[in-house]
Amino acid sequence: NPDAIKDVKLFKGAIPSRYGGRVSSVLEIFQKEGNSKEFKMSGGIGAVASRLLAEGPIIKDKAAFLIGGRASYAHLFLPVFDIENKAYFYDLNTKLSFTINENNNLYLSGYFGRDLFAISDRFENTYGNSVGNLRWNHLFSDKLFSNLSLIYSDYYYGLELDFVGFKWNSGIQNFNLKYDLKHYLSDTFQLNYGINNIYYTFNPGKIVPNSPDSGILEDQLIKKYANEFAAYVGAEHTLSEKLSLQYGLRFSYFMRLGQDELNVYENDNPVIFDPFLLVYQEATPIGTISPDRGERLATYTNFEPRMALAYTLDPDNSIKMSYTRTTQYLHLLSNTSSPTPLDVWTPSGPFIKPQLQDQYALGYFRNIDEGTYSFETEVFYKDIQNRIDYIDGANLIANNAIEQVILNGNARAYGLEILLRKNTGRFKGWLAYTLSRSEQRTPGREPVEDNGRSNKETGINFGEWYSTPFDKTHDVSLYASYDLNKKWSFNSNFVYQTGQPTNYPVGKFEFQGLTVPFYGLRNQERLPDYHRIDVAATLTPKKNAGRTWQAEWVFSIYNVYNRMNAASINFRRNQDTGANEAIRTSIFGIVPAVTYNFKF
């Protein structure tokens, strides 16, 4: 809910040492603390979605509350446009703030959100988060303060397949205890340091029949457990008026803990390579063990250095460069090209190594015409070890031995980002363009003793680099806004992205009376390119003197030219002609909306 947000920061290149556990960018979100002096309310009522936020004092200047919610209902109007799909979301933000004394503050906040989308009567996908956070802020002095946080998070992912006859869900629960300190040693030197510990419970999946006569038996996959500890120190150092540095080190220690049952494999290798068929296959377990919950199945230790430099060439020009190492101990198992999307998280362990990323970036910034315009560009390169992929025909759903279909490989991503802004005047806007590649090679080319694979294996796509599902060669965003007068303003944006890599059948064969498709090299085809235009007009009525009520009307059209962008492409046989045909699955077309925003 944007009304509940105080500030947002995105870290793509130079990620501070206080953040870890992921090899992607970091989005830092600061929630409002609630107004302790007076009651305020804001919100918006629209044809597609509505939102409401209320905040105010419980005890003036001592305690405050904040509560806000959002919900969308665009799916109610989709049948008007002959669209049988559904897509909606709802969420709730809450926060209580208490000022104990001038040196101590206590905060209790919560978040609950759900997203749902369904494709006709084929499947329904639901996912979301529930988060609770108790934080104690303590001021030791005007130069040192700390935050002690106890956080609970519950991630849920559900999939209902009516044509199969079952509901499936998975998720992660974690308890996070973290202690962060910020120390201003001088006007030019600042230290950040702290520790945190996360205990994970993974639910790989639970199957529940959606009707008594479905023929499906209820089944709970074996839950997995892990613990992740980290300690960090980071410095922000201004060396001169022109040169500033950010540097730090993060230490992480991950333990995969015992579970009810674990397979044992010959040579500890759950995936074998058939040199005659040139395919990877699931290895047959040679036994099982039942380790205690507190037993360590695998441990990993990593040091993650961070370094960033910013140098001002002159008042209008500056350069920056950074190096970041991050480690991710959790792996997302996702079949993004499937017509029924699937997301499952699994921890690193005896057979699955953590991902290690080294990222390098070099950027240039320039102010033009005394800040009227600005220009930014950055080149980056990422090297990732132990990025996972799957063997052909991998079963990701209801699989208690997921290690039998996973291969560790390497990945790389590199590209150029350009951003041109107009910052002042009645006409403002920006143009952003990214040229990039995201590729992987599976298995990786480490020595045999490091990855447990034979150097005689061909690898996926014959051991060559191939596109990851996240590869977007071209990514263009264009935004423009124009303030016509004090009442009317207009804005529009255009988005274009190269289509997502996917797999299409290259042939078929008959097996026991069934037509079975077969595929060529992995991720060699792409979905159609994604693009759309959105427009909006905002009417701000004249504010009445002496009234605190402020309001505006927003008239918008999402996807003006009704582009039915493909979420996936599915192949089927036409029942009338018998011919094979490709079916595009899309979520939204054109969506007009009117929203009334207010605050007081």
Model-predicted regions and their roles:
Residues 19, 34-39, 59-63, 102-103, ...:
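Short loop/turn motifs that connect adjacent beta-strands in outer-membrane beta-barrel proteins
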Residues 380-383, 402-506, 597:
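Gram-negative outer-membrane beta-barrel transporters
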Residues 1-38, 51-53:
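A beta-strand signature from Gram-negative outer-membrane beta-barrel systems
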Residues 147, 151, 318-324, 330, ...:
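Membrane-embedded beta-barrel scaffold of Gram-negative outer-membrane proteins
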Residues 41-47, 67-71, 108-112, 148-154, ...:
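Transmembrane beta-barrel strands of outer-membrane/channel proteins
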Residues 199-314, 445, 457:
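Signature of Gram-negative outer-membrane beta-barrel scaffolds
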Residues 487, 495-514, 528-534, 538-600:
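C-terminal beta-signal and adjacent terminal beta-strands/loops
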Residues 46-73, 82-116, 124-148, 152, ...:
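Transmembrane beta-barrel wall of Gram-negative outer-membrane proteins
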